[in-house]
């Protein structure tokens, strides 16, 4: 739909985004959740195989390998490999670094590999922490707003506090997890919602 109304915008996607990706719903067969393969050859789509500098201000980096950092909510995400359903390796995910003057910002999606691991990769690339992060944290699974155990949220808050950033999050973070993280990181959490406008 987007490409049918915008004839100029470039779309950058990791090549793996066009793979056979599926979601699991309890008691149901795997449901295809990937992209239409026909879009891969669209003239406005640029397929990437790793990190990519769009220009001096915008830099994309793909998924990060973070053993143990991915959230339990990922268990419903699958991909097809050699005719078998396996856990999604999340190689289709990417994050965006925005460089504006002396400010640095991180924009991620649902951070399925763990926002803390993505922040660590940001620091490796930039040599510093971001000033602000806009991302889902993928702490609540499909169809539930239940938060992870408090010890898991406390451990995440400790990782986040080491980066001295302000965090704007919503969607897959879940309301109860957001409220608890706001208590653990006072003054450093902001809620993202559709139509929100703010200055960084």
Label every model-predicted segment.
Residues 51, 193-198:
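Glycine-centered loop/turn motifs
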Residues 54-60, 143, 178-179, 199-200:
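Short, solvent-exposed polar/charged micro-motifs at secondary-structure junctions
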Residues 1-46, 50, 64-73, 158-166:
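Active-site HxH/HxHxD metal-binding segment of metal-dependent hydrolases
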Residues 1, 10, 86-95, 99-194:
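Cap/insert and terminal regions of metallo-dependent hydrolase folds
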Residues 21, 55, 62, 68-71, ...:
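Short acidic/glycine-rich loop or secondary-structure boundary segments that cap or lie
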Residues 17-21, 140-141, 196-199:
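Short gly/pro/ser/thr-enriched loop/turn and capping motifs at secondary-structure boundaries
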Residues 26-28, 50-102:
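Active-site-proximal loop/helix segment associated with metal-binding centers of metalloenzymes
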Residues 42-46, 57, 184-190:
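Active-site regions of enzymes building and remodeling cell-envelope glycoconjugates
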């Amino acid at each position: 739909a987007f490409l049918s109304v915008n004839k100029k915008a470039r779309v950058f996607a990791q090549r793996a985004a066009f793979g056979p990706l599926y979601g699991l719903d309890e008691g149901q067969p795997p449901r295809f959740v990937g992209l239409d393969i026909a879009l891969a050859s669209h003239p406005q789509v640029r397929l990437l195989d790793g990190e990519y500098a769009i220009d001096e201000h915008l830099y994309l980096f793909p998924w990060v390998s973070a053993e143990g950092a991915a959230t339990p909510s990922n268990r419903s995400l699958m991909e097809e490999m050699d005719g078998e359903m396996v856990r999604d390796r999340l190689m289709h995910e990417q994050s965006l670094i925005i460089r504006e003057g002396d400010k640095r910002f991180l924009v991620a999606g649902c951070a399925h590999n763990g926002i803390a691991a993505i922040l660590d990769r940001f620091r490796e690339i930039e040599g510093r922490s971001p000033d602000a992060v806009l991302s889902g944290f993928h702490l609540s699974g499909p169809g539930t707003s239940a938060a992870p155990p408090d010890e898991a949220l406390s451990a995440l808050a400790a990782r986040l506090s080491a980066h001295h950033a302000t965090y704007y999050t919503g969607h897959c973070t879940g309301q109860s997890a957001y409220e608890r993280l706001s208590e653990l990181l006072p003054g450093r959490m902001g809620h993202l919602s559709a139509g929100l406008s703010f200055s960084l």
